[in-house]
Curated annotation (Swiss-Prot):
Protein name per the record: Elongation factor 4
Key words of the record: Cell membrane, GTP-binding, Hydrolase, Membrane, Nucleotide-binding, Protein biosynthesis
SMART domains to which the protein is assigned, alphabetical: EFG_C
Membrane topology term: Peripheral membrane protein
Length: 600
């Protein structure tokens, strides 16, 4: 009997908040994978932060056993994927491990940007797509319209799409039937050399790195010597098994078509990269599975401990997070204003926020983070070129021939009423209009090319507020383009605060400088001497604000009396303030570093 016939590998894709994790919970419950006692909300979102924000950050997997009415038993491997645009690569690898994908669409909201993006990823991997319409128990649900929309926009048959409610558990059985009926059984040859895809990996302090794998060909069991194809390192498999979401060891190993995990005393997640191919050391496969890309950081930011003595602890915290997150990179850097810290690279803004929160939460450290910046390519007049991740390292303008910045292709889905507002926002952010298509009478998808550094700060928040939260955004890196950029420095009391430096387009330097100076004026507390806040490009000051000094009323004790007496006291005070200003240092509160981001 060929057991592959009874295996189905599928994942669930959806836009944020369309009910992906809740549907996964119901499927686990329906197939009796977990007892009622173990059942909690969002079982597959294991991180505290995931539960709190209601988002999936790491991919998870579970093995469900489904008995059909005719007595046949099927093994369904569910691979949960993150829905956020920062983790697109992780999603694409999870999808490559499946043969089918359930496309969850919210019956009240319809198709949104991420739905489309993830759906196209699934189509790129030749997956069978099973549409499921969720939240039909809500009064505002419009299942029939949405079916039509799925057919029109994505072009897949949706007439028989199950109408479910993951919250109440309505029609979940239909989803399981659809998976068995529509998703093809895995193919693969058990006797061929081993070929398996790592679609996720994490570090366990007892077992080393646990690799989630999908075996394409061959088989793997404890004792097999395996080789990872991107690094050519060889390990011996210690344990193989499946997920019930918890790890359950299986002595007999995994064979073609199955999804499970292996451990092989690997010390670092970087050695078992997502997307890599595992093969036998003795009998390697000819070629690796396609699509492997090392994770490339898109956004950089400085992280510093508030208390300089905690530098080593911060280093340890980042190292621990890095063990579990191959996409995080960091290197030590020093700042005149903030002391010793690290320059960290992230996949995107959400990834950055999550790492920062985890450092604060899991390691109880107080940190200061600087404004995020993207990677610029700088070419100097002597022909040398380099990647710039930190604005402070920019050479003087006279030595630069030209600079290039990353540009993304953004697709924004919005109700037609807000088309004008969205286009205005994109134009304002130096966007180049490409095209727009109507999805239906009331919704439109707009494509723009926008420089990444315009998106990094607060594009998403502004987009949401301009469209009352209805618009959704998805973007992918298009490449680098030349543009006129300058470095904006902020001087406090005549000293350059390096942590506030940023790179801005020349045309926006004045308004950005003006806005930052005004913002800092509100945030920096008054000192005993006056503090000038200046924004400068090169040696030219383009904006100035002054935080007035606190002063004692030195004339209070003079009642009447001669004017020269008063003058003498005022002069004396002025002298003192001047001396203070030369010696004094300006305290910059933590909010100042963050407020620079929110300037618009």
């Amino acid at each position: 009997m060929d057991k592959k016939k009874y295996i189905r590998n599928f994942s669930i894709v959806a836009h944020i908040d369309h009910g992906k994790s809740t549907l996964a919970d119901r499927l686990l419950e329906k197939t009796g994978t977990l007892t009622q006692r173990e059942m909690e909300q969002q079982v597959l979102d294991t991180m505290e932060l995931e539960k709190e924000r209601g988002i999936t950050i790491k991919s998870q997997a579970a093995r469900l056993i489904y008995k059909r009415e005719n007595g046949e038993e099927y093994i369904l491997n569910l691979i949960d994927t993150p829905g956020h645009v920062d983790f697109t690569y992780e999603v694409s690898r999870s999808l490559a491990a499946c043969e089918g994908a359930i496309l969850v669409v919210d019956a009240t909201q319809g198709i949104q940007a991420q739905t489309l993006a993830n759906c196209y990823l699934a189509l790129d991997n030749d997956l069978e797509i099973v549409p499921v319409i969720n939240k039909v128990d809500l009064a505002s649900a419009r299942p029939d319209e949405i079916k039509q929309e799925i057919e029109d926009v994505i072009g897949i048959e949706a007439e028989d799409a199950p109408l479910v409610s993951a919250k109440t558990g309505l029609n979940i059985e239909d989803v399981l039937e659809e998976i068995v009926e529509k998703v093809p059984a895995p193919e693969g040859d058990e006797n061929a050399p081993l070929k398996a895809l790592i679609f996720d990996s994490y570090y366990d302090s007892y077992k080393g790195v646990v690799c989630h794998i999908r075996v394409k060909d061959g088989k793997v069991k404890p004792g097999t010597k395996i080789k990872l194809m991107s690094t050519d390192k060889v390990y011996e498999v210690v344990e193989t098994g499946v997920f019930t979401p918890a790890l359950m060891p299986l002595k007999e190993g995994l064979s073609a078509g199955e999804v499970g995990y292996i451990t092989a005393s690997i010390k670092n997640v970087r050695d078992a990269r997502v997307g890599d191919t595992v093969t036998e050391a003795a009998r390697p496969t000819e070629e690796a599975l396609p699509g492997y890309k090392p994770a490339i950081p898109m956004v950089y930011s400085g992280i510093y401990p508030v208390d300089g003595a905690k530098y080593e602890e911060l280093k340890e915290a980042l190292e621990k997070l890095q063990i579990n997150d191959a996409a995080l990179s960091f290197e030590p850097e020093t700042s005149v204003a903030l002391g010793f810290g690290f320059r960290c690279g992230f996949l995107g803004l959400l990834h950055m926020e999550i790492i920062q929160e985890r450092v604060e939460r899991e390691f109880n450290l107080d940190i200061i983070t600087t404004a995020p910046s993207v990677i610029y390519k700088v070419t100097k007049t002597n022909g040398e070129s380099f990647d710039l991740t930190n604005p402070t390292n920019l050479p003087p303008m006279t030595e630069i021939a030209y600079m290039e910045e990353p540009v993304v292709k953004a697709s924004i889905i919005t109700p037609t009423d807000y088309t004008g507002a969205v286009m205005e926002l994109c134009q304002d952010r130096r966007g180049k209009f490409i095209d727009m298509q109507y999805l239906e009478e009331t919704r439109v998808v707009i494509h723009y090319e926008i420089p990444l550094n315009e998106i990094v700060y607060d594009f998403f928040d502004t987009l949401k507020s301009k469209t009352r939260g209805y618009a959704s955004l998805d973007y992918e890196l298009k490449g680098y383009e030349q543009s006129k950029l300058v470095k904006l420095d902020i001087l406090l009391n005549g000293d350059n605060v390096d942590a506030l430096s940023m790179i801005v387009p020349e045309v926006k330097a004045y308004q950005r400088g003006r806005a930052i100076a005004e913002k800092l004026k509100e945030i920096i507390p008054r000192h005993m001497f006056e503090v000038p806040i200046q924004a400068a490009v090169g040696s030219k000051i383009i904006a100035r604000e002054t935080v007035k000094a606190m002063r004692k009323d030195v004339l209070a004790k003079c009642y009447g009396g001669d004017i020269s007496r008063k003058k003498k006291l005022l002069e004396k005070q002025k002298e003192g303030k001047k001396r203070m200003r030369q010696l004094g240092t300006v305290e910059v509160p933590q909010e100042a570093f963050m407020s620079v981001l929110k300037v618009d």
